[in-house]
């Protein structure tokens, strides 16, 4: 018997394993479920090895879209998705996704092939200083020096991506490592890293925050995507209802408390921000999205209570009255404890609530009037009114564009947390289809039956439109709505277009924001086997969307034509719309 064991041990000591398989096993050990990428030399074997272990590999048409998809998986699941890219240009294409993940604080792992070690500084194929280049866009960027170190580096990258403020990490894999063989007994896989530690705010600071809130006459809660990521929906909703507090979600904070909740004051956004005397920030940064917390968008003496997981974020742009460093859900529960001990409410019949309700009613009436217009082509409000009428309550909404995203945000409701993905903190165009693919995969595995509605401006669709083939290849029942105004911000109708081109060439005549009028984007979908609809009227929109929602077997694209000069309703403040056009 001892001789048999010795023989088995001897056999195992001679067993070899490739670098590709070590990478795949190390990722599997860290509970990585999804990998997106564009394969080629030298990373194809890594994708194949990952599939052998049950990691889902989704081949995309561009590294940028692959990186966007992987980062969205990180946000939706709390575990990083992996983006696999080839060396040099392949990695460069992924930098946009890495930067976007870091700016949005989403966990992401990028694995990039690189030139062989023995060819360094010789002008090797696609040679580039990749580790150094990625440091600007990541929390951690490293290259294992041996195959044996790969599991250590992968565990550290996964842990770094989810601990503290989440973000992107990069792992550089030399081409010769992929096929290089190592003794199987020399590889020591690291245990799956533990979930991120949950930190709580100082008790004295929590008491101070509760005291400031009790003294408020015009309180406001702002719910950011940090609250969504920390799964704080139950605690924040309880706080909202128990204290009768008005709340305003940021774009990806929508759904933490449902948009149709009576305490949601999204329709009175500007008035709420400008008039509040105490504002509690739940995982929301005072960046451009919230106008930096400064006048004239806010009162000069407004008091901020800032809750964030990242200490460096506290106090940016304004000095908070109270800072609460910790996990958003944990700190929300700490605040609830204070109001459980000594109940308090913002009076529902207060002048503050009356002011907000009046402004909401006024703004909603304007939007309703715009939505009810019968003229053709349709305007944005008419389109989104009819979409909202049929939108399933549990839908994932992915949105990008200019007016398409801004108006859609106000009219398309989210009722569940982590069910809205958009251009985010970085204002990134081109994310839409990658995000939609990620959401569809996560929905399929974790919440079967939930639909993904991807709402794109026609310009935004152009950034990653070829990912329609990816959607069809994996048969993801995504519904794409391309809101088509023939341009970036605004375009021209076909008659005006023809007149412009009659006397001069397009390069000197066509305004920079114009796109080809009446482009049939729905044919991109039908070319790959999905369903496409060319929509001009409310009746056609209702019919085609109803059919798309009923058919769960194929992806669909609705190309919705609107008035080329359609725009937003008049705004109290011109937010990102300063232009002389």
From Swiss-Prot:
GO terms for cellular component: nucleoplasm; peroxisome. Thiamine diphosphate binds at residue 63. Homotetramer. The keyword Lipid metabolism applies. Residues 404-487 are annotated as: Thiamine pyrophosphate binding. Belongs to the TPP enzyme family. This is 2-hydroxyacyl-CoA lyase 1. Keywords: Fatty acid metabolism, Lipid metabolism, Lyase, Magnesium, Metal-binding, Peroxisome, Phosphoprotein, Thiamine pyrophosphate. Predominanly expressed in liver. Binds 1 Mg(2+) ion per subunit. Binds 1 thiamine pyrophosphate per subunit. It is found in: Peroxisome. GO terms for molecular function: 2-hydroxyphytanoyl-CoA lyase activity; ATP binding; carbon-carbon lyase activity; identical protein binding; lyase activity; magnesium ion binding; thiamine pyrophosphate binding. It comes from the Eukaryota.
């Amino acid at each position: 018997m001892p001789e048999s064991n010795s023989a088995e041990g001897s056999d195992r000591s001679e067993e070899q394993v490739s670098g590709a398989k070590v990478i795949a096993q190390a990722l599997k050990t860290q509970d990585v479920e999804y990998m997106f990428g564009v394969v080629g030399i030298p990373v194809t074997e890594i994708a194949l090895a990952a599939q052998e272990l049950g990691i889902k590999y989704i081949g995309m048409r561009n590294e940028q879209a692959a990186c966007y998809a992987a980062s969205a998986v990180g946000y939706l699941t709390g575990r990083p998705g992996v983006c696999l890219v080839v060396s040099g240009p392949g990695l460069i294409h992924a930098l946009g996704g890495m930067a976007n993940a870091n700016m949005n604080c989403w966990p992401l792992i990028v694995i990039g092939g690189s030139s062989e070690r023995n060819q360094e500084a010789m002008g090797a194929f696609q040679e580039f200083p990749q580790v150094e280049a990625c440091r600007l866009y990541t929390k951690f960027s490293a290259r294992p020096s041996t195959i044996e170190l790969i599991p250590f580096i992968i565990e550290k990258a996964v842990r770094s991506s989810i601990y503290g403020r989440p973000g992107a990490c990069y792992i550089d894999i030399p081409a010769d490592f992929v096929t290089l063989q190592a003794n199987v007994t020399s590889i020591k896989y690291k245990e799956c890293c533990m979930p991120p530690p949950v930190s709580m705010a100082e008790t004295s600071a929590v008491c101070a925050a509760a005291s400031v809130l009790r003294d408020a006459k015009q309180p406001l809660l702002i719910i950011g995507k940090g609250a969504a990521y920390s799964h704080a929906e139950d605690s924040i909703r309880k706080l909202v209802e128990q204290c009768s507090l008005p709340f305003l979600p940021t774009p990806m904070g929508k759904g933490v408390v449902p948009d149709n909740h009576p305490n949601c004051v999204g329709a009175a956004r500007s008035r709420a921000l400008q008039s509040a005397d105490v504002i509690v920030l739940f995982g929301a940064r005072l960046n451009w999205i919230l106008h930096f917390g400064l006048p004239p968008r806010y009162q000069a003496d407004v008091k901020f209570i800032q809750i964030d997981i990242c200490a460096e974020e506290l106090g940016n742009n304004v000095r908070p009255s109270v800072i609460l460093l910790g996990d958003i859900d944990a700190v929300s529960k700490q605040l609830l404890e204070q109001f459980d001990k000594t109940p308090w409410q913002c009076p529902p019949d207060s002048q503050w609530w009356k002011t907000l309700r009046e402004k909401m009613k006024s703004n909603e009436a304007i939007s309703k009037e715009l939505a009810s217009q019968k003229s053709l082509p349709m305007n944005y409000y008419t389109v989104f009114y009819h979409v909202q009428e049929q939108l399933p309550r549990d839908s994932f909404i992915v949105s990008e564009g200019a007016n398409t995203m801004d108006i859609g945000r106000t009219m398309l409701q989210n009722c569940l947390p982590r069910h809205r993905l958009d251009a985010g903190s970085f204002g990134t165009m081109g994310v839409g289809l990658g995000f939609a693919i990620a959401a569809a995969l996560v929905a399929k595995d974790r919440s079967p039956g939930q639909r993904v509605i991807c709402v794109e401006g026609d310009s935004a669709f152009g950034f990653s439109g070829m990912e329609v083939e990816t959607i069809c290849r994996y048969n993801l029942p995504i519904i794409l709505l391309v809101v088509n105004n023939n341009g970036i911000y605004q375009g021209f109708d076909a008659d005006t277009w023809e007149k412009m081109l009659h006397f001069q060439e397009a390069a000197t005549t066509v305004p920079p924001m114009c796109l080809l009028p009446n482009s049939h984007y729905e044919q991109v979908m039908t070319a790959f086997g999905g369903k496409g609809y060319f929509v001009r009227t409310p009746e056609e929109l209702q019919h085609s969307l109803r059919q798309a929602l009923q058919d769960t077997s194929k992806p669909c694209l609705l190309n919705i034509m609107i008035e080329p000069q359609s725009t937003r309703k008049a705004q109290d403040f011109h937010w990102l719309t300063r232009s002389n056009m």
